[in-house]
Structures are given as structure tokens and as C-alpha cells.
Amino acid sequence: MLEDKEILTMYHFEGKEDYAFNLIMRKYSDRLYRHIIKMVQNHDDADDILQNTFIKVWRYLPDFREDSKLFTWLYRIATNETLTFLKKESVKRFFMLSSAKITSTHQAYSDPFFNGDQIQFKLQKAIKRLPPKQRAVFNLKYFEDLKYEEIAEILGGTVGSLKASYHHAYTKIEQFLKEND
């Protein structure tokens, strides 16, 4: 796979916009999808958000000036699209979906033949309870293992505020896991 600089050179200077965009999609689709699904925990919603992300990338790629890394710019768009989606969700729909997922997962969890990882189940349940911004910070740091500087490029904000947000998320998850042990 080509380096980001080579892809961007193709896009901006060689007249190969479609080809370069296709390379970006192939290179980053899976990674962005994993980031989005961890926040929305629904396949169809994640697919829609990923599609909206790439629509915005297509629209704004001509203006991308490489002030940040391509992957952090893509993550910022994906994260913003995800946060917008989460905000737009009505309270009723959110609770209906959450209730249905928890009920079905809980039924599987209580099934003697269910061999899912109990810790993973509890962790996902705890993460889902976090406010969207804390959820984003936690997922980027814990699962994606990004540096705070990279997360700052993606989400905006200062490194200090992101560290505090991660600490609050970590504390809430830890408390949830202790209370639900």
C-alpha cells in the first residue's frame, strides 16, 4: 500500500482524484469502521456513518493542506460524524435500541451455552454508558492506542483536557465494573 504522501500527491498533482480516493478508502475503511462501531455498537448505523464520513472526505479532500496527518484528519471526520449521529438520535430511539441490545445480550449471557467473555461484555456495557465525547476519547486511547497529541488532532481540545476526559472515563468504567461484579 502506498504511503499517504504518495496518495495525496496523486490526488492533488497528478489528476488521479478517483484512484487516490479509492486508495484512501481501501486503506482506512476497516480502521475507521472499527472506530465507529465501538462508539455506536450497531452495524447498520456504523455503515451509514462510515459512508457519510467518506462523502465528507470526498467533498473536503481538495482543501486538505496536510497540516495534520491524513489518518488523524480522517478520524476527526469519522468521530465528528459519529458524535453528530449520537446527538441526533432521539432519546426514545436510543433507549429502545439500548434496551433491546442489553436484553438480547443479557439473554445470551445468562444462557449456559453462551461462551462470550464476561469481562468484555461488562466493559462494552460500561463504555456504552459514557457520554459520547468521553467514549470517543476512551476508544481512541484504549483500543486504538493513539497518543494524546493524535487524539487532540482528531477531536480538538488540549492534551490536558483529553487526559482528564480519559481519566474520568476510566474511573467511571472502573466504578461500573466494581458495582456490577
Residue ranges, per PLM feature:
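Short, Lys/Arg-enriched C-terminal cap helix and immediately downstream tail that follows
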Residues: I36, K87, L130, R135, ...
